[in-house]
Structure formats: structure tokens, C-alpha cells
């Protein structure tokens, strides 16, 4: 009986201990779940803050680049891709407009969706067949603008870009989680996101209303899908890669360079592992994406031959021109160093470590700076940068904006590989210093195409809203670049030169003042100060001639802009 009582007591004690352990386990699981939820919320808040930072700069954007106005026109104009089409002008890209008196409504019809034209994707598709770019970005911009018919504002385009920027940041974070290992992988991924988002290139990309932000999203998503396929290749992932390639090529043709290099490297990787089934599946999916683009937008070949500056012929000339090889990459690299800021400094450090590795202390000497899987994703991006720098028609960073998230990932991998050789306190202090420097430079360095000062010019033009207005067209890009300023006036007399009969009929001298826009004549963002002075003298002579026609005695220049000068004539 005593033995039975002891056995009962032991069982009771064991049951109490098991219940206690169960409660403790549940509490631990609950605490882990709470910590995970808090970490997820913190990550989402941080990523949202990066997007909001771009909004801080977007508020300061006061003007439009000519190509941004083409974005609105090609998206929203009803079967008329360029202003030169409105009055039987030359129906070609950047053609010459017929002389005509444009009304304010004409310009609004070009850049804003009108009632009855909302969600008209057939018009958008048609407009893009007459342009030099595929249509996906313009479909999206038209969709956003269709929600606000009759409105022309930077915020429709910037709002779209913010959504695309947020998607890019999220994809970059997920890509970092695929590449980095260990319990701090999420912190390293956030660092890479910040390194990208706080760079001048990223902010310039997010605040430029063109297809490059969408191109960046598709580039990052392609890298993410392939990184996942490296860990666990599946047919579904290959099909998704094919879809992303299809959409990317329908966004901008330079997408094919990184996509081709990345796919070639991955195919070679699979061949080395003798995974022939995956070689066939992956290659078929990727080629299906390319073929789908060719079938759904068959005018791609004509577009690649449609201009003297943006064509396959120019690309071939640039490839064969040996002087391009040091010039193009070095020129673009120099600009990228300034815009990338801290990232460029990290890349220089990695280059220095790689060159002097055998002379460094043992732990750093044995460190692998870039892991093999990270190399497979990022090295094609660096190679694509060089290729684009050689073949691009203009040496502009916008053609390589889409590669920068992968450059940031490359820098992040090398940065943490070096840091991991140091002590914990040193790692913490260096990381904090680098993050602080990133934040400071992000506020100090002004992104491209902010046009700070245009607001003041527009306020001054508003004072002359009742005055007559003349525009010497020059070329259509220059003429289009002044569209936001034209909206201050009821009508604009657009002529080719001062000998125009229409100009002489228009200059009646009825108003006390006249505003004259003189467009083109070689004036644009890359001319030297000496050339600007010479062009200004020619423009002043034209303004004085118009003043004589209208009986005006005072001729003053109001502003010099990228493609034109604004003159005010008074009696």
C-alpha cells in the first residue's frame, strides 16, 4: 500500500511538472511570436520611412524634364503622341510642328486625360508604336491619370513612382534575405536597402517620371526570383522569371542586357552541375518571355531603327568605336561615384582589399568578400553597367538606374564580409558611422532634375497671363519642354522663326507686354558657358526683332532653362 501511494504521488508530481513545462513552452512560443511580429512591424516601418524620404525630395521638385512631359503626353494624348501631330505637322518622333496658334486647352489635352478618354489603352498602345519605347510604363501612368481626368500634376507620376519604389525596396530586402545568412541577416538586408534608398541615383530615379523606376523594380524582382531558384529550382519559379522578363522588355529595351547576362550565367551554372532538365526548363521560360514581347509589341524592331541617336546602328558604331571603351565607362562611373556616395566608397574599399589581400592580416586574408551566389546575381549587373556605358546614345545615369539595387547588394555583401573579421564593438561603431554618413549625404546632395527655382519663374509668368505669348519652336523636344510654362497663357503663337507671316499678323501690339520663348538653337543641359553666352546673344537679337514688330521698347531675359530662354517684352 505504501508503494502504491508513492507511485501515485510520483505520477502526480510528473503531471504537475509536465503541465508547468507546457505552460512555459507556450509562453516561450508566445514571446517568440510577439518578437517576430514586432520585428516584422519594425521592418515595414523602416521600409516605409525610406519611401517617405523620397517624398521629402519630391515636394521640392519644381519642374519637369522634357522626357517627363513626353511620359504624360504619350500616356494621355488621344492618338496624338507628339504636339507636332496636332496641326498637321511632321508625323515623326521629335518632328517639326506646323506654325499655329495653340490654345491652353491644346496643351492640357496633350498631358491630361480628358473625359471620355479614361482607361483608353488602345490609344496608349498606338502612341507607343510611334515612339521609341515599349508601352507597359505608359499603361500604368495612364491608369493613374485616368483616376484624375482633366488634371496635370507631378503627383500622379510621382505617386506611381513611390509605389514602384516601395516594391523595389521590398524586393531588395527579400533578395538580401536570400543572400545573407545568420540571425542578423534581416539587419544586413535593411542596411542594403538603406544604402540604395539614400543614394542620389535612387532618389533621382524615384523622382523622375519615366519608365526607369518600373525597370528597376523588374530588374530587382528578376534577381530575387533567380536567387530563390538557386536555392530551390522549380518550374513555377522559371515561369515567373519568364513573365518578369516579358514585362521588363516591354518596359525598356536596356532591360535585355542584364537579363541576358544573368540568364547566361545561370544556364552555365546549371550546366556545370549537369542539371540538364533545369537548363531546358529555364531556357524555355526565359526565351518565352522574349518571344512574347516580340509578338505582343511587333514594332520593336522598327523602333530600334527609328532614330539616328537611339538605334541599333548607333549601338553598333559605339561598340566598334574603340575610344568609347575607356571614355563611356569612365564618364558614367565618375557620375555614379558622386550619386552613389557611400556605396561608391564601400566599393572602392572592396577593390583595395581585393588588390592587397595577400598582404593583409590572416583573418581578413582568408575572407571571401562576395559569396558565390551573390556573385552570380551581382556580377552580371556590374558587367551590364559597362556594356550600357559603351553603347548608350547619351552618357546619362538614367540608363543604369535599374542596376543600382544590385550594386548596393554587392557593396553590402563585401562590407559585412570585412566587418565580420572585426570585434563586435568595432563592427557596431563602423556601421553606425556609415549609416550616419548615408543619411547626411542623402539630405545634402541634390538629386537630378529637381529644377529648384522653376516655381519662382512660374510665379513671375503668372503676372503676364493676359499678355500675348510667342514661341520660336526650334525643335519639338525644346518646344515641348516649356509646356508647363505655356499653361499660364490663353494662347501661344508657335512659329519657326521671326520671318513668319503668322508672327507678323499676331504681333499687333494690343497688350502692354509679350512673353517670348526661344527654344532649341543648341541650348541644352550639357553646353558650355561660352556656348550659352553666344546662344543668348542670338536669342536677344530675335527677341528684339519681335519687339520691333509689336512696338515694344524693353527687352529683358526672364530665365534660361535647359532647352530654351524666356524673354519679356514691354512698352
Task: Show which residues each predicted segment covers.
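Signature aromatic-anchored transmembrane alpha helix within multi-pass, membrane-resident enzymes
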Residues: 1, 45-48, 287, 415-446
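Hydrophobic/aromatic-rich transmembrane helices and adjacent perimembrane loops
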Residues: 67, 379, 391-423
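Interfacial juxtamembrane loops and adjacent helix segments
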Residues: 78-133, 145-150
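Specific aromatic-rich, kink-prone transmembrane helix
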Residues: 143, 171-174, 194, 198, ...
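Transmembrane-helix motifs of polytopic, lipid-linked glycan transferases
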Residues: 156-182, 221
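Transmembrane alpha-helix segments characteristic
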Residues: 190-192, 240, 245, 285-291, ...
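Perimembrane helix-loop-helix junctions
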Residues: 223-240, 245, 257-291
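Membrane-lumen/periplasm interface segments of specific transmembrane helices
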Residues: 268, 272, 278-318, 322, ...
Amino acid at each position: 500500500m505504501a508503494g502504491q501511494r508513492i507511485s501515485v504521488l510520483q505520477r502526480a508530481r510528473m503531471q504537475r511538472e509536465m503541465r508547468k513545462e507546457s505552460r512555459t513552452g507556450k509562453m516561450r512560443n508566445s514571446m517568440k511570436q510577439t518578437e517576430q511580429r514586432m520585428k516584422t512591424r519594425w521592418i515595414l516601418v523602416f521600409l516605409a520611412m525610406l519611401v517617405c524620404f523620397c517624398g521629402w525630395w519630391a515636394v521640392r521638385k519644381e519642374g519637369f524634364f522634357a522626357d517627363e512631359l513626353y511620359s504624360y503626353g504619350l500616356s494621355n494624348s488621344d492618338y496624338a503622341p507628339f504636339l507636332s501631330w496636332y496641326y498637321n505637322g511632321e508625323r515623326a518622333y521629335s518632328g517639326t510642328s506646323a506654325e499655329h496658334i495653340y490654345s491652353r486647352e491644346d496643351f492640357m489635352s496633350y498631358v491630361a486625360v480628358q473625359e471620355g478618354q479614361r482607361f483608353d489603352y488602345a490609344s496608349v498602345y498606338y502612341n507607343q508604336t510611334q515612339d521609341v519605347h515599349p508601352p507597359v510604363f505608359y499603361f500604368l501612368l495612364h491608369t493613374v491619370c485616368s483616376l484624375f481626368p482633366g488634371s496635370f500634376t507631378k503627383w500622379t507620376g510621382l505617386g506611381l513612382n513611390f509605389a514602384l519604389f516601395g516594391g523595389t525596396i521590398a524586393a531588395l530586402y527579400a533578395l538580401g534575405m536570400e543572400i545573407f545568412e545568420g540571425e542578423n541577416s534581416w539587419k544586413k538586408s535593411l542596411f542594403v536597402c538603406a544604402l540604395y534608398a539614400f543614394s542620389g541615383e535612387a532618389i533621382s530615379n524615384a523622382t523622375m517620371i519615366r519608365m526607369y523606376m518600373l525597370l528597376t523594380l523588374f530588374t530587382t524582382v528578376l534577381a530575387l526570383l533567380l536567387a530563390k531558384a538557386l536555392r530551390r529550382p522549380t518550374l513555377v519559379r522559371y515561369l515567373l522569371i519568364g513573365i518578369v522578363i516579358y514585362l521588363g522588355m516591354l518596359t525598356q529595351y536596356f532591360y535585355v542586357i542584364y537579363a541576358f547576362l544573368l540568364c547566361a550565367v545561370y544556364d552555365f551554372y546549371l550546366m556545370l552541375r549537369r542539371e540538364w532538365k533545369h537548363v531546358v526548363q529555364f531556357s524555355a521560360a526565359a526565351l518565352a518571355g522574349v518571344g512574347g514581347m516580340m509578338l505582343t509589341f511587333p514594332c520593336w524592331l522598327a523602333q530600334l531603327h527609328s532614330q539616328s541617336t537611339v538605334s541599333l546602328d548607333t549601338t553598333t558604331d559605339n561598340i566598334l568605336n574603340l575610344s568609347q571603351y575607356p571614355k563611356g565607362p569612365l564618364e558614367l562611373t565618375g557620375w555614379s561615384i558622386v550619386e552613389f556616395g557611400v556605396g561608391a566608397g564601400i566599393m572602392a574599399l572592396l577593390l583595395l582589399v581585393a588588390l592587397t589581400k595577400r598582404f593583409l592580416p590572416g583573418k581578413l586574408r582568408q575572407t571571401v568578400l562576395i559569396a558565390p551566389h551573390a556573385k552570380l546575381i551581382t556580377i552580371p549587373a556590374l558587367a551590364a553597367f559597362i556594356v550600357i556605358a559603351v553603347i548608350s546614345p547619351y552618357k546619362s545615369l538614367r540608363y543604369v538606374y535599374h542596376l543600382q539595387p544590385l550594386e548596393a547588394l554587392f557593396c553590402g555583401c563585401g562590407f559585412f564580409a570585412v566587418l565580420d573579421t572585426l570585434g563586435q564593438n568595432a563592427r557596431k561603431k563602423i556601421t553606425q558611422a556609415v549609416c550616419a554618413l548615408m543619411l547626411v549625404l542623402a539630405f545634402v546632395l541634390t538629386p537630378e532634375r529637381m529644377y529648384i527655382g522653376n516655381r519662382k519663374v512660374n510665379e513671375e509668368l503668372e503676372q503676364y497671363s493676359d499678355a500675348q505669348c510667342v514661341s520660336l519652336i526650334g525643335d519639338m523636344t525644346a518646344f515641348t519642354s516649356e509646356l508647363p510654362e505655356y499653361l499660364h497663357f490663353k494662347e501661344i503663337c508657335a512659329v519657326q522663326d521671326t520671318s513668319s507671316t503668322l508672327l507678323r499678323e499676331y504681333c499687333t501690339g494690343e497688350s502692354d507686354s509679350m512673353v517670348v520663348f526661344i527654344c532649341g538653337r543648341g541650348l541644352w543641359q550639357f553646353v558650355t558657358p561660352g556656348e550659352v553666352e553666344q546662344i543668348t546673344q542670338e536669342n536677344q537679337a530675335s527677341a528684339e526683332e519681335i519687339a520691333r514688330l509689336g512696338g515694344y521698347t524693353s527687352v529683358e531675359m526672364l530665365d534660361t532653362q535647359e532647352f530654351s530662354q524666356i524673354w519679356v517684352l514691354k512698352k
